[in-house]
């Protein structure tokens, strides 16, 4: 009995080894692909226009625009009339030239300004500008009121009065007390021009030195005032 069961068991194991496995079940069916909503099915990479055919109408329009620009015609805006160019006023005429028209050049009016001031009357024949004749020649010009009239008159008349006035003006300020004494004027009866000139030069030199000393004293006092705290 044991021997009869053993071969049957071995034959069953051989059948399991030689038996093929069952086939796998097929995969489930996949849903169809849906296109994107923003994609346009009519436009495809194969339907793109060629570069020669692209923008043929635009090239004609660009050429027409270039022609208009070369001609210089401005493009009028829709709803507006033609553009008016501003007109400039004509330039003023050039002033007349010539030797006898010197006064007329001053009378040219500039636009935007008032009339020129009253000009003096033209000189009479034989009269030079700045040198009047007749009664005006007899009267000397008025002396200036700035305090230097005496000095100029004194220099023209020999320098005696002008130099005395200058020295007196310095002493009135309180700084001319220690100045050098004025030199005695030369004797007019001698008639020596060289002595007169030498005396005047010495006097002018002394006055100049005194003026330099006064200026230096004023500057020293000024710097001292600046150096002292207020």
Curated annotation (Swiss-Prot):
Cellular component, GO annotation: host cell cytoplasm; host cell nucleus
Compartments, as annotated in UniProt: Host cytoplasm; Host nucleus
Record region (Disordered): 1-192
Keyword Phosphoprotein belongs to the record: yes
GO biological process, one term: symbiont-mediated arrest of host cell cycle during G2/M transition
Basic and acidic residues composition bias: residue spans: 50-78, 128-140, 148-163
Main location: host cell
Keywords, alphabetical: Early protein, Host cytoplasm, Host G2/M cell cycle arrest by virus, Host nucleus, Host-virus interaction, Modulation of host cell cycle by virus, Phosphoprotein
Domain of life assignment: Viruses
Feature: compositional bias, Pro residues: 20-35, 87-98, 113-123
PTM statement from Swiss-Prot or TrEMBL: Phosphorylated by host ERK. The phosphorylation triggers a structural change that enhances keratin binding and protein stability.
UniProt function note: Contributes to multiple aspects of the viral life cycle including viral genome amplification, suppression of suprabasal cell differentiation and egress of newly formed virions. Induces host cell cycle arrest at the G2 phase by associating with and preventing the nuclear entry of host CDK1/cyclin B1 complexes. Inhibits cellular DNA replication by preventing loading of host replication licensing proteins MCM2 and MCM7 onto chromatin. Within the cytoplasm, associates with host kinase SRPK1, a splicing factor regulator, and inhibits its activity.
Family: Belongs to the papillomaviridae E4 protein family.
Additional observations: The major E4 form is first synthesized as an E1^E4 fusion protein from spliced E1^E4 transcripts, such that the first few amino acids of the E4 protein are derived from the N terminus of E1.
Subunit structure, interactors included: Assembles into oligomeric complexes. Interacts with host CDK1. Interacts with host SRPK1; this interaction may favor expression of late viral transcripts. Interacts with host cytokeratin components KRT8 and KRT18.
Name listed for the protein in its UniProt record: Protein E4
Organism expressing this protein natively: Human papillomavirus 47
Lineage of the organism: Viruses, Monodnaviria, Shotokuvirae, Cossaviricota, Papovaviricetes
């Amino acid at each position: 009995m044991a021997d009869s069961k053993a071969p049957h068991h071995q034959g069953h194991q051989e059948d399991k080894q030689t038996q093929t496995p069952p086939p796998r079940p097929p995969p489930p069916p996949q849903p169809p692909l849906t296109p994107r909503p923003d994609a346009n099915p009519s436009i495809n990479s194969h339907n793109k226009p060629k570069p020669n055919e692209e923008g043929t109408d635009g090239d004609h329009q660009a050429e027409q625009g270039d022609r208009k620009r070369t001609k210089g015609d401005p493009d009028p805006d829709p709803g507006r009339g033609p553009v008016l160019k501003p007109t400039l006023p004509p330039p003023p005429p050039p002033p007349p030239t010539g030797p006898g028209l010197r006064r007329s050049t001053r009378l040219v009016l500039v636009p935007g300004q008032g009339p020129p001031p009253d000009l003096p009357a033209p000189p009479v024949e034989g009269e030079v500008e700045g040198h009047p004749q007749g009664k005006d020649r007899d009267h000397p010009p008025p002396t200036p009121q700035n305090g230097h009239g005496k000095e100029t008159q004194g220099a023209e008349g020999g320098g005696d009065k002008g130099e005395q006035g200058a020295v007196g003006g310095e002493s009135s300020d309180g700084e001319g007390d220690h100045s050098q004494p004025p030199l005695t004027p030369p004797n007019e009866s001698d008639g020596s021009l060289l002595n007169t000139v030498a005396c005047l030069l010495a006097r002018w030199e002394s006055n100049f030195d005194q003026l330099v000393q006064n200026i230096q004293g004023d500057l020293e006092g000024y710097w001292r005032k600046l150096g002292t705290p207020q």
